[in-house]
């Protein structure tokens, strides 16, 4: 056991599962904020791979300021058109020259972004429905120094910041996550009428769970208002079934609640994303590192996507804290609710946080002191293995939104 500063104490609150009101949100992969997160992270991995291939190690960069400016569209039954394209600007810092070698950073970034859009928002036509641009400046000199060289075994923190994570997920969290992933997975495969811009909001009040879904419907697959209404009802029934796989509580599902059938005002799109019709996007405005927005729990405001995976605390500590929480809950019996907070200090090795704080709600028959040594050992071991987070991120084994 090392001398890392690890604090473990009982949480002075009820477990989130036992609180009267719980709110959970997830923005789907086609939401404008998620599009920015996805592009930023895809570009990040592409740049990491470029640097590894060309110079043998990851150089200083960040792409976590990527922005989306919404377009304008005229959706219509059986197919409308985009009249003003979506504009996506990949923004950040990157090392473009190393030891006299010029590196194709901008072209790598644009290529990665276009590939991501083709794979995840297939109804978008590149060049006409969406334009991808890039502005990557040089990095700050002092931060490049903190970033260090390839022979540094444990990188130094690039910032004084923190990351948070929790486990296990509540029933409401599981439902919200599963609903979006199922709609944007198997359901969309069989029902192309639903676009990837899906937002799911869950509200639990005591033992009643309300799920509200906003789903962008693709106009070319909708013949008329009756056809649209049938598609919405199919989604509602599917979501209800998914929710009941995760809870025995009462569940109510509503889909596209702003629709007004009397006036014909419905959530119809050309491409399956609200980005085509006035909804802008930014990195870090959507899901946290575990894929959820959870106002009942502490959250970091850091944008995880697009940050450098070597020493950027806003990425590493948010992913690591979640990994620690999940590892502890998986290996230690009797934990009902666990919150992990990791705080860095700029220039300090990332495996030695300023503090690693664990707040725990145990089952009623479990004494925290009895399980504390096991919890401490897991936290210490995961911190010692912090550099594995970098490899897992580059290999696309960890999601950031």
UniProtKB/Swiss-Prot annotation:
Keyword Protein transport applies: no
One Pfam family per UniProt: AdoMet_Synthase
Cofactor: Mg(2+)
Coiled-coil regions listed: none
Gene3D superfamilies reported for this sequence: 3.30.300.10, S-adenosylmethionine synthetase, C-terminal domain (3.30.300.280)
GO molecular function: ATP binding; magnesium ion binding; methionine adenosyltransferase activity
Reactions mediated catalytically: L-methionine + ATP + H2O = S-adenosyl-L-methionine + phosphate + diphosphate
Magnesium keyword on record: yes
Residue numbers binding ATP: 137-142
Pathway info: Amino-acid biosynthesis; S-adenosyl-L-methionine biosynthesis; S-adenosyl-L-methionine from L-methionine: step 1/1
EC number, as in UniProt: 2.5.1.6
Uppermost EC category: transferase
InterPro entries in the record: AdoMet_synthase_2_family (IPR027790), AdoMet_synthase_3 (IPR042544), S-AdoMet_synthetase_arc (IPR002795)
Alphabetical keyword list: ATP-binding, Magnesium, Nucleotide-binding, One-carbon metabolism, Transferase
GO biological process assignments: one-carbon metabolic process; S-adenosylmethionine biosynthetic process
Family annotation (NCBIfam families): PRK04439.1-3, PRK04439.1-5
Task performed by this protein: Catalyzes the formation of S-adenosylmethionine from methionine and ATP.
Family recorded in the similarity comment: Belongs to the AdoMet synthase 2 family.
Name of the featured protein: S-adenosylmethionine synthase
Source organism: Haloquadratum walsbyi (strain DSM 16790 / HBSQ001)
Gene expressing this chain: mat
């Amino acid at each position: 056991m090392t001398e890392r500063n690890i604090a473990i104490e009982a949480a002075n609150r009820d477990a989130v599962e036992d609180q009267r009101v719980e709110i959970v949100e997830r923005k789907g992969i086609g939401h404008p904020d998620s599009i920015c997160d996805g592009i930023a992270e895809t570009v990040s991995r592409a740049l990491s791979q470029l640097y590894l291939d060309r110079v043998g190690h990851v150089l200083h960069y960040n792409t976590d300021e990527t922005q989306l400016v919404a377009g304008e569209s005229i959706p219509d039954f059986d197919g409308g058109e985009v009249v003003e394209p979506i504009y996506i600007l990949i923004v950040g810092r990157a090392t473009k020259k190393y030891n006299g070698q010029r590196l194709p950073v901008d072209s790598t970034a644009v290529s990665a972004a276009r590939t991501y859009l083709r794979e995840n928002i297939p109804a978008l036509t590149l060049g006409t429905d969406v334009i991808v641009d890039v502005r990557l400046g040089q990095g700050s000199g002092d931060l490049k120094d903190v970033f260090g060289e390839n022979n540094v075994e444990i990188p130094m923190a690039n910032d004084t910041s923190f990351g948070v994570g929790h486990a296990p997920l509540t029933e409401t969290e599981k439902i919200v996550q599963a609903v979006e992933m199922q709609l944007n997975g198997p359901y969309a495969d069989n029902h192309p009428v639903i676009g990837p811009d899906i937002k799911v909001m869950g509200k639990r009040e005591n033992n009643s769970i309300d799920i509200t879904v906003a789903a962008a419907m693709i106009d070319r697959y909708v013949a008329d208002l009756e056809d649209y209404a049938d598609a919405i009802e199919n989604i509602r029934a599917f979501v209800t079934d998914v929710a009941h796989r995760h809870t025995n509580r009462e569940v109510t599902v509503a889909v596209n609640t702003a629709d007004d059938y009397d006036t014909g005002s419905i959530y119809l799109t050309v491409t399956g994303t609200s980005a085509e019709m006035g909804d802008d996007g930014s990195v870090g405005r959507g899901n946290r590192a575990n894929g959820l927005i959870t106002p009942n729990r502490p959250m970091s405001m850091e944008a995880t996507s697009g940050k450098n995976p070597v020493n950027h605390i806003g990425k590493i500590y948010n992913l690591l804290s979640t990994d620690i929480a999940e590892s502890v809950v998986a290996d230690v019996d009797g934990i009902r609710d666990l919150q992990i907070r990791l705080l860095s200090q700029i220039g300090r090795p990332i495996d030695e946080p300023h503090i690693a704080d664990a707040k725990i709600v145990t089952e009623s028959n479990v004494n925290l002191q009895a399980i504390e040594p096991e919890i401490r050992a897991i936290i210490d071991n995961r911190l010692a293995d912090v550099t594995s987070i970098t490899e897992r991120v580059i290999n696309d084994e960890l999601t950031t939104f």
